[in-house]
Amino acid sequence: MRINKFIANKGICSRRKADELIKEGKVKVNGKLVIELGLDVNEKDNVEIDGIESLESQNLVYFMLNKPKGYICSSSDEKGRKTVLDLVKTKERIYPVGRLDYDSEGLIILTNDGDLAFKLTHPKMQVSKTYVVKIKGQIKESELAVLRAGVKIGDVKYNKCKVKVIATDKNWTKLSIVLFEGKNREIRNMLDFIGKEVILLKRVAISELKLGGLSRGEFRPLKDFEIEYLKNI
């Protein structure tokens, strides 16, 4: 088994985060520093991670959180800012799946299931994420067409997305935006590219899993059928 999957299966972090820990020189196998991301290990190997006292397997848990503004999607923050883990109380060691930036809000899944985290975040899986975005002013059909076609900003290519106007006023416009990838600050950067200022950015669904009536800052365990649905996307 590849070492990143081994670590993820123990509920430590996602496969992607495990790769980061290896690159940072924080993982040892049988006393030797791991330098190969694709290293194969098994249960007989002694795997150590800096700062983690035990790699005993945990019960898998799954939570939905309505993240408020002012929290970061990380297990810790070197700047001392509040993280989403401050809002979800559980004895299991969990981590957020994907991210919402500091000033955004809405649906975040937290779990210790590394395989599910991998499935929901890997670009090749094309799992849709739906957002409600409120911007200042109006938006032209030609500008919507630019967003739908995808844009390149510097060296970063943002792929096609689904965009439609769902409400409008003389001072603002509310959009529904569906993404199929998860680049950092993707929506904000695309809207800035066409000269639009974001007032509100809220994720309301991951594939067909919807935030529903969960209040800001509240969380709940995912129901069995929701977990099965996500695993079978």
Task: List where the protein language model places each region.
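Basic, flexible Lys/Arg- and Gly-enriched helix-loop patches that mediate nucleic-acid binding at interfaces
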Residues: 1-233
